[in-house]
Amino acid sequence: MKILIDDANIDAIKALYPVYPIDGVTTNPSILAKSGRQPYEVLKEIRAFIGAEAELHVQVVGRTADAMLEDVECIHAELGAQTYTKIPVNPAGLEAIQRLRKAQPDAHITATAIYTPMQAFLAAKAGADYAAPYINRIDNLGADGIATAKIIQDMF
């Protein structure tokens, strides 16, 4: 099991790191936008604080497989190839995950925007290392987010 902070607030990250056994940080475009700063400026500050050995998950913003793969190249160029790229599980994202896995077998891939166990299954088959279900959003849609996450966990 790993503990990841889902935040881009460097002060919050710095406050939590000495208290809890944190394995890394996840971000997304909405979290980064709340900082009011340039995304890569924030991400580089996070990377510098947590170190190269800790996990940093950064989401692509492209809408096509080609655009997502361009985002991956940019993320790796700015933050290092050890950075996990978060790719949404939609048709373009599944294509991007497969192409990235084939081109870079050692790439670190987190499948995101997952609402169902089938999406997680498809992401794993495509080559994702992690599946990140949207538990709160699943709950907001009237389903049970925790139960969905348990099903996904049991599948693997």
What is each of the regions a protein language model found here?
Residues M1-K14, V19-I22, T27-A103, I135:
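Active-site beta->alpha loop and helix N-cap motifs at the rims of alpha/beta catalytic domains
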Residues P91-L94, A107-F156:
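Catalytic alpha/beta core domains of metabolic enzymes, predominantly
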